[in-house]
Amino acid sequence: EKKLSGNFLVVIDGTPECESAVRYAARRSELAEKELVVIVAIDNQKETHWLGVERKIIEEAEENTKILIEQLQKNISGFSKVNISYEILHGSKINIVNNIIRDKSDIGYLVIASNNKGESPGELVEFISKSGFSIPVVVIPGDISNDNIDELVGIK
C-alpha cells in the first residue's frame, strides 16, 4: 500500500503547461519537505531502418533533454530550494509513469498539467481519467498563473 506522504513526481516534456505542473510540484514538495522527482520521457518509438540514424535521433533527444533540465533547474532555483532528482527514461510517458508508481514506494503524488489549447487534455490526463493510479493525482490547468499556483499551494 502506498503512503500518502511520499515524494512528488512530475513528468516534463518542454510544453508551456508542464511549467505549471513543475511550479506546483516544487512548491508542494518544499512545503511538505519532500523531494521533487522530475522525469523526462524520451519516446524513441520512431523506427528507422538504419541503426546509425536511430542512434543519432536518440543522442539528439538526450542532448535536448539535458538542455531542458538545465533550464528547468535554473527556473526552479529562482523560486524554490526544493531537493530535486532527475531521471531521463526511454519509452512512452504512460508506461514510464505506470512503472515508476508501481515500483517506487517513495512516490506519493503525481502532478500533471492539462493542455490549455482546447484540444485533448494530454495523453497522461486522458489515461488517468480512464484507468487511475494508486496515488493521488493533481491536475493543474496548463494556463494557470504563477501567482495563482502559489496561492493554491498556500504561499501567498
Model region roles, listed by residue range:
Residues A21-R27, I96-I100, L124-F127:
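A short acidic, amphipathic alpha-helical/loop segment
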Residues Y24, E60-L72, I96:
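Short, solvent-exposed amphipathic alpha-helices that sit
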Residues V40-I67, I149-I155:
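Acidic, proline/glycine-rich short linear motifs
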Residues V37-I39, S85-L89, V138-I140:
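General small-molecule cofactor/ligand-binding pocket signal
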Residues D103-K156:
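Gly/Ser-rich helix-loop-strand patches that form or flank binding pockets
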Residues K3-G52:
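Small/aliphatic-rich secondary-structure junction motif
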Residues S77-S85:
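A short helix-to-beta-strand connector/capping loop
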Residues I88-I96:
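Charged docking surfaces used in two-component/phosphorelay signaling
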